[in-house]
A protein has these predicted regions:
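Soluble "head" domains of membrane/secretory-pathway proteins
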Residues: 2-186
Length: 186
């Protein structure tokens, strides 16, 4: 029995170390990714209730073995121009969805994304959350990405400050671990 307990504790310890080395944990600080990632509003205070916000696990190694894909929800370091436009702290980490890849011709109007002239199907964006600024038609250069919040009307994203460099992408969201009623993988 003691041997089984030691094996179990060793396995748990190894998992904790691996997660710590290969992943990073974040709390969702805004409603920009609603309804995919939740940050409940509070009428008494600006912003959202941090204690009830989704907590996510982001892989720091995933993009070492594969390229980012359209639809990935990613954490990234906000570029300097985004810090100014969004009123964020330098070094801030944002979480949004990749909607355009290098080589795509992308345009965003009234929250609707068009890739190479065709409307991008986005079942994760609710009709009432469309809108926000536009993004003029352009071809995305190598190692650059367009990221948007699923709550287009309330998101400070690529439409406000431009493209995200691949080197600034920390990694994709691989799990939601809090609150317990929203636990999910990928």
């Amino acid at each position: 029995m003691l041997r089984l307990l030691l094996i179990l504790l060793t396995v748990v310890g190894v998992v904790i170390v691996l997660v710590g080395v290969t992943s990073k944990l974040y709390r969702v600080p805004t409603s920009s990714m609603e309804p995919t990632l939740h940050c409940p509003k509070d009428d008494e205070i600006p912003g959202c209730r941090g204690d009830d916000a989704d907590r996510i696990v982001v892989s720091r190694v995933w993009y070492r073995v594969r390229d980012p894909e359209r639809g990935d929800v990613v954490a990234y370091e906000l570029p300097a121009r985004g810090v100014r436009r969004c009123g964020a702290e330098p070094g801030a980490t944002f979480v949004h969805r990749i909607v355009a890849l290098p080589g795509d011709r992308v345009e965003v109007r009234a929250g609707v994304v068009r890739i190479d002239g065709r409307r991008l199907e986005e079942d994760y964006v609710e009709r009432g959350r469309m809108g926000g600024p536009s993004f003029r038609s352009q071809v995305i250069p190598d190692d650059k990405y367009v990221v948007l919040g699923d709550n287009r009307a309330q998101s400070c994203d690529s439409r406000a400050w431009g493209l995200v460099d691949r080197d600034d992408i920390i990694g994709p969201k691989i799990a939601t671990y809090w609150p317990e009623d929203r636990i999910s993988v990928r």
